């Protein structure tokens, strides 16, 4: 009887932990997707980097993307 109760509790704990982890991971923004300037929401090992856009010398706004942490893009 004790073995059945212990097995049931262990199974319940395992299912609960898997569910919590899935909820936490599902809430992040994937690589290459648009993010906001608050630098939050990108999946692990990603950061929200923002770049200002210019057209004919006039600033046209800012675009932010989730990219790998430490990666810098430049115009050649």
UniProtKB/Swiss-Prot annotation:
Xref: InterPro entries: Spider_toxin_CSTX_knottin
Signal sequence, renumbered to the chain: 1-22
Keyword Coiled coil included in the entry's annotation: no
UniProt-annotated location(s): Secreted
Molecular functions (GO terms): toxin activity
Tissue: Expressed by the venom gland.
Post-translational modification: Contains 4 disulfide bonds.
Keyword entries, A-Z: Disulfide bond, Secreted, Signal, Toxin
Propeptide boundaries: 23-26
Top-rank taxon, per record: Eukaryota
GO cellular component, one term: extracellular region
UniProt record similarity statement: Belongs to the neurotoxin 19 (CSTX) family. 07 (U7-Lctx) subfamily.
Record's protein name: U7-lycotoxin-Ls1c
Species name: Lycosa singoriensis
């Amino acid at each position: 009887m004790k073995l059945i109760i212990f097995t049931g509790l262990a199974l319940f704990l395992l299912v609960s932990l898997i569910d919590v982890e899935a909820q936490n991971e599902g809430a992040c923004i994937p690589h290459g997707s648009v993010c906001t300037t608050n630098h939050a929401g990108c999946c692990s090992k990603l950061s929200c980097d923002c770049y200002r856009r210019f057209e004919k010398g006039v600033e046209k706004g800012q675009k932010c993307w989730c990219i790998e942490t430490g990666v810098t893009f430049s115009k050649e």
